[in-house]
């Protein structure tokens, strides 16, 4: 079978947003080539004998590729919508780089499985490791928690800097027994991690029905996540039950309207963990948190990305 491969040359910062755009444009599959992924893998596995030159890869930026059957009749419309949506990411403060769009004909569907050989288990934090669903990797020490994900979904693999910041913050703040909301769950990795770290009750939300389905598939891959409830919802609108922790890894401009909602739903001294914040949006997020009477406990850094740990001040 022949396919049309559509490629967007962009930045590490924009890969997840571009992937989501492709998903909304009915791509059959999405592939991400990210120069930073190779550096992260090498840094996470310093003892492994691995020559990056043996694996075809780009050395800077990222390429997000999507696949459409060659008989797709509206490919020109898709390309036009893609260009508009990618350019609009600038309005959310994302650096999209050159954002060039190219197409190429692919002769068969080997792309659908060939990428699997480049995915390996990755140690994300002190205790949390993410592995692809087909890997038979087992925990190598007693406290290691292994999360199984299907990287074929266009909602991240747990290794993006914003996800790492959230996972680190969860590990820093959770003590066991917490109730938690995961807002903008995507792959569901944060919800699964929360269960591994001792959360007693987790609910996950995403505005995208496809993300909800992807998260449910990943929950099904992890026995510890079998009781996580996931549903489509616009942030926390209509949610009434207070919880101990709220975690959100979404764009800064979406975090801002979430903050007053989180204020109403967090128990006294509960933790609010935010990520997806580029450096020049950090002040806006922190100012909004303070205006809503949150206490800033810590700001985490990973490259150009920032994460914030805040607590809901106890009423005097």
Curated annotation (Swiss-Prot):
Q: Does the keyword Cytoplasm apply?
A: yes
Chemical reaction(s) catalysed: L-lysyl-[protein] + 3 S-adenosyl-L-methionine = N(6),N(6),N(6)-trimethyl-L-lysyl-[protein] + 3 S-adenosyl-L-homocysteine + 3 H(+)
Q: Which gene encodes it?
A: prmA
Q: Where in the cell is it found?
A: Cytoplasm
Tell me the InterPro entries matching this sequence.
Answer: Ribosomal_L11_MeTrfase_PrmA (IPR050078), Ribosomal_PrmA_MeTrfase (IPR004498), SAM-dependent_MTases_sf (IPR029063)
Summary of the function given for this chain in its UniProt record: Methylates ribosomal protein L11.
Listed GO biological process terms: methylation
Which GO terms label this protein's molecular function in UniProt?
Answer: protein-lysine N-methyltransferase activity
Q: Does the keyword Transferase apply?
A: yes
Could you tell me which species this protein originates from? Pediococcus pentosaceus (strain ATCC 25745 / CCUG 21536 / LMG 10740 / 183-1w)
The EC number of this protein is 2.1.1.-
Q: Which residues bind S-adenosyl-L-methionine?
A: 163, 184, 206, 249
Query: Which family does the similarity line name?
Result: Belongs to the methyltransferase superfamily. PrmA family.
What keywords were assigned to this record? Cytoplasm, Methyltransferase, S-adenosyl-L-methionine, Transferase
- The domain of life for this entry's organism is Bacteria
Name the chain's protein: Ribosomal protein L11 methyltransferase
Gene Ontology cellular component annotations, sorted alphabetically: cytoplasm
């Amino acid at each position: 079978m022949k396919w049309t491969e559509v490629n967007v040359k962009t930045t590490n910062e924009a890969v997840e947003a571009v992937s989501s755009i492709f998903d909304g444009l009915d791509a059959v599959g999405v592939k991400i080539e990210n120069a930073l992924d190779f550096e992260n893998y090498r840094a996470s596995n310093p003892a492994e004998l691995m020559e990056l030159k043996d694996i075809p890869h780009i050395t800077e930026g990222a390429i997000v590729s999507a696949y459409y059957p060659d008989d797709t009749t509206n490919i020109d419309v898709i390309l036009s919508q893609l260009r508009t949506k990618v350019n609009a990411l600038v309005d959310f403060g994302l650096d999209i780089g050159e954002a060039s769009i190219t197409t190429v004909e692919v002769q068969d569907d080997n792309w659908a499985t060939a990428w699997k050989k480049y995915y390996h288990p990755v140690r994300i934090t002190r205790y949390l490791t993410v592995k692809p669903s087909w890997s038979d990797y087992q925990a190598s020490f007693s406290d290691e928690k292994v999360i199984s994900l299907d990287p074929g979904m266009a909602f991240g693999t747990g290794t993006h800097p914003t996800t790492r910041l959230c996972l680190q913050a969860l590990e820093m703040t959770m003590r066991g027994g917490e109730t938690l909301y995961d807002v903008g769950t995507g792959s569901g990795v944060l919800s699964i991690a929360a269960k591994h770290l001792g959360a007693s009750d987790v609910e996950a939300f995403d505005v995208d029905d496809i993300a909800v389905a992807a998260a449910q598939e990943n929950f099904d891959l992890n026995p510890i996540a079998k009781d996580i409830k996931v549903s489509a919802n616009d942030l926390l609108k209509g949610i009434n039950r207070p919880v101990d922790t709220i975690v959100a890894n979404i764009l800064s401009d979406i975090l801002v309207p979430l903050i007053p909602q989180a204020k109403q739903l967090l128990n006294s001294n509960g933790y609010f963990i935010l990520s997806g914040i580029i450096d020049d949006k950090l002040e806006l997020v922190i100012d909004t948190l303070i205006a809503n009477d949150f206490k800033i406990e810590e700001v985490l850094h990973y490259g150009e990305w920032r994460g914030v740990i805040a607590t809901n001040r106890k009423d005097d």
